[in-house]
Regions:
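N-terminal capping/lid subdomain adjacent to the active-site entrance of alpha/beta enzymes
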Residues: 1-147, 152-154, 161, 165-168, ...
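General beta-strand structural signal in soluble alpha/beta enzymes
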Residues: 9, 75, 147-149, 176-177, ...
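Short glycine/serine- and small hydrophobic-enriched flexible loop segments
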Residues: 63-67, 243, 269-272
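Catalytic beta/alpha-barrel core
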Residues: 95, 117-126, 148-153, 170-183, ...
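Active-site-adjacent beta->alpha loops and helix N-cap segments on the catalytic face
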Residues: 99-101, 123-139, 155-159, 179-193, ...
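Glycine-enriched alpha-helix->loop->beta-strand junction motifs that scaffold or abut catalytic
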Residues: 111-115, 139-143, 165-173, 191-198, ...
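Active-site capping/gating regions of soluble enzymes
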Residues: 220-225, 231, 237-247, 251-253, ...
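Flexible C-terminal active-site loop/helix
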Residues: 257-323
Length: 323
């Protein structure tokens, strides 16, 4: 093999979330590999409905292109971030637990330098979650800590308005996906009336064509998008979301989806590139800046990981020290 053509990518579908992930996934992956070898090109249009496959091949192509330039195969999109000159602020993640467990985790995240925490809600009794949030806000004010919550579609359309009103007492920055996807009338109403800004996440899965994306943004008008390349169209599909959201004045942040350091490296570099180029070139001048904090800390969950990348978190900021 010619080492100069070396490229590294990652396909990391998620069970129950990636619509293309089924018993035939690996067979399809091998078929795409053969087509790419024969044609020596990547047919992105043919892979629109297979975002994790598209993401893997896109990152491998970008990696090979970097190798051909004589650069590290990990420098996919040259930016100040990928050159180690700047970092990307990221949120910490705290799961629901007892008050003592959550307070200890919050204190640990603050000591580590995080100033934005995402809390998963909807897994335990809602009244208990409210009690825990009330206690936590007594310890950590909005000036100390930005709180984002992620409901993962836990609320019904009927109960969601009242629950959002209760949550709004705690200075919540935003709530991700309060109700399950594909309930557009209810979601549009929540986006109009919720006292907490709404960020769409699972709602974007399976919405892969530009016309569909345009319609979703026009009809739902969310306050934010949460973009995950493995789930939301690969690199190219995510860039489409970014351009459209910028034109609609809807800020986004980018989140990894349990990829290893190979995928996380690509997602982080896309995040930095998009902030430099895509948002700046497409957003109206009167639209707010992108949220500074992204969700790129999931590599910490691995016991063993790809070690050639040197993605390091310092004081709540992700740095690329690979070079």
């Amino acid at each position: 093999a010619n080492h100069s053509l070396y490229g590294l990518g990652e396909c990391a579908p998620l069970h129950d979330l990636s619509p293309e992930y089924d018993a035939h996934y690996e067979t399809f992956l091998h078929a795409v590999s053969r087509r790419v070898e024969q044609s020596r090109r990547l047919d992105r249009e043919a892979l629109r409905n297979h975002p994790s496959v598209l993401f893997g091949f896109e990152t491998a192509f970008l990696s090979a292109r970097a190798s051909l330039r004589g650069e590290s195969h990990l420098t996919l999109l040259p930016t100040p971030f990928s050159l180690g000159q700047t970092g990307i602020p990221i949120n910490g993640l705290v799961w629901m637990g007892t008050y003592e467990e959550m307070r200890c985790r919050m204190q640990e995240k603050l000591r580590e330098g995080f100033r934005c925490i995402k809390i998963k809600i909807g897994a335990i009794d809602f009244n208990e979650e409210i009690r825990l949030l009330r206690l936590l806000r007594q310890d950590f004010s909005p000036a100390d800590l930005q709180l984002r919550v992620d409901a993962n579609g836990a609320f019904s359309p009927e109960e969601a308005p009242a629950r959002l009103r209760e949550l709004s007492a705690f200075g919540i920055h935003s709530i991700e996906q309060p109700i399950r996807p594909r309930q557009w009338d209810a979601m549009a109403r929540l986006c109009r009336e919720s006292p907490i800004p709404i960020a769409l996440d699972e709602e974007l899965i399976g919405v892969n064509h530009p016309r569909e994306k345009e319609r979703l943004l026009r009809e739902l008008r969310p306050q934010y998008l949460v973009l995950k390349p493995t789930l939301h169209g690969g690199m190219a599909g995510t860039e489409e979301w970014m351009r459209l959201s910028a034109r609609h004045g809807i800020p986004y942040w980018v989140t990894s989806a349990l990829e290893s350091n190979v995928g996380l490296n690509a997602v982080a570099q896309l995040t930095a590139y998009a902030a430099e180029k895509i948002w700046r070139e497409n957003a109206p001048e009167n639209v707010a800046h992108l949220p500074a904090t992204h969700g790129l800390g999931t590599g910490q969950l691995y016991l063993k990981n790809y070690t050639a990348t040197r993605l390091v978190i310092k004081s709540g900021v992700l740095h690329d020290l690979t070079l």
